[in-house]
Regions:
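Conserved Ser/Thr-centered positions that define the repeating blades of beta-propeller domains
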Residues: 60, 170, 234-235, 285-291, ...
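Short beta-strands within extracellular/lumenal beta-sheet-rich domains
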Residues: 24-36
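Surface loop/turn signatures of beta-propeller and other carbohydrate-active proteins
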Residues: 25-28, 63-82, 102-138, 157-160, ...
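Noncatalytic modules at the cell exterior or secretory-pathway interfaces
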Residues: 42-43, 84-96
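Bacterial Sec-dependent N-terminal signal peptides
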Residues: 1-21
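Conserved small/polar residues in nucleotide/adenosyl-binding loops
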Residues: 310-317
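Beta-propeller domains
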Residues: 151-177
Length: 317
């Protein structure tokens, strides 16, 4: 079955000056959506109680990543934006969505997304994302007059999933500007919690004062958790991050499933960087001179811990 829509400038579903063509092809449980002259977003209708379908912005590259989205089948509870590649064509693949799903009829193209919130009980003083789901605060740092708040974030629903690092900045810790997600889920897995540093020494060679993020990549293989530590660096004051090609930088030497939440700090007496990782019932320490190659040092503690916050009187962060 093929469905073809011609969307012109000024139409409700397209705010671009160039006409967009949206073509949908379905075969079995797979839907292919081709958009010519794509707008910034494909607006996705969501139905909370439906099972997740798998959605992917397809380019044929190894970096293509599936997102789990509760696309509307019977009714639309709300909508979320899905960013499209800019150029002549964007291709979106969906697996697990019925042919008669409401989402296929109501999805729209747009260059904007209305983030106005009308929920009476929505917090005003405490930070919340414009839309989606959040929990752990990650990578809290200060640079050039800005406080950076990264956080666990699902931009495609109000439940846990598709872990990204969301990002907001503030100059007073009260008023926050919401930015695009800084680090997105990728083929290595969800982007779990971690920390950031400002590399004032240029230890990693990405440039003096580059912001470097360390996070846990989480995936499931053969029914077991796989958690490894990765790094990404930013040269534009934390707005966007480039994932290090040598990831992962730390893996559990004994195959632990619970191995996450890296915290990085500088220890002046040894003139080294240290990483502390929650390793099941212990905390493991790793040492590095260049922030890329890490050597296991020791472990400490008994009992389960996560999202560690460790400082030293000799630390210089």
């Amino acid at each position: 079955m093929k469905i073809k829509y011609l969307l012109s400038a000024g139409a409700l579903v397209a705010l671009s000056a160039t006409a967009q063509t949206l073509q949908t092809t379905q075969k079995g449980d797979t839907t292919i959506i081709k958009v010519e002259n794509p707008t910034k977003y494909l607006i996705l209708p969501i139905e909370e109680e439906r099972p997740e379908a798998q959605l992917q912005l397809y380019s044929g590259k190894a970096t293509d990543t599936w997102m789990d989205v509760r696309l509307a089948v019977g009714k639309t509870d709300y909508c979320v934006p899905f960013a499209l590649t800019q150029g002549k064509e964007a291709v979106v693949k969906i697996v697990g969505l019925p042919k008669d799903a409401v989402a296929l009829k109501e999805m729209k193209l747009s260059d904007t997304f209305d983030t106005t919130n009308t929920d009476y009980y929505r917090p005003v003083y405490h930070h919340t994302p414009l839309y989606g789901w959040m929990n752990d605060a990650n990578g809290l740092t200060y640079k050039d007059g800005e406080y950076h708040l990264y956080f666990q974030y699902n931009p495609y629903g109000s439940k846990w999933g598709n872990m990204h690092w969301g990002h907001s900045v503030s100059r007073d810790l009260v008023h926050w500007d919401h930015l695009d997600p800084a680090i997105a889920r990728d083929p290595m897995g969800h982007i779990f919690s971690g920390s950031t540093i400002v590399d004032t020494r240029n230890s990693a060679g990405f440039g003096k004062n580059a912001i470097i993020a360390y996070y846990t990549s989480h995936s499931m293989r053969n029914g077991k958790q796989v958690q490894v530590q990765c790094m990404a660096y930013s040269k534009d004051n934390g707005r966007t991050f480039i994932k290090y090609k040598g990831n992962p930088v730390v893996t559990p030497f004994d195959g632990l499933e619970n191995f996450r939440d890296p915290k990085i700090f500088w220890y002046e007496p040894t003139k080294s960087w240290y990483m502390i990782v929650s390793a099941d019932k212990n905390m493991r320490f790793y040492q590095s001179k260049n922030l890329k190659k890490w050597t296991y040092v020791s472990q400490w503690g008994e009992g389960f811990g996560a999202c560690l916050l460790y400082t030293s009187d000799a630390a210089d962060e």
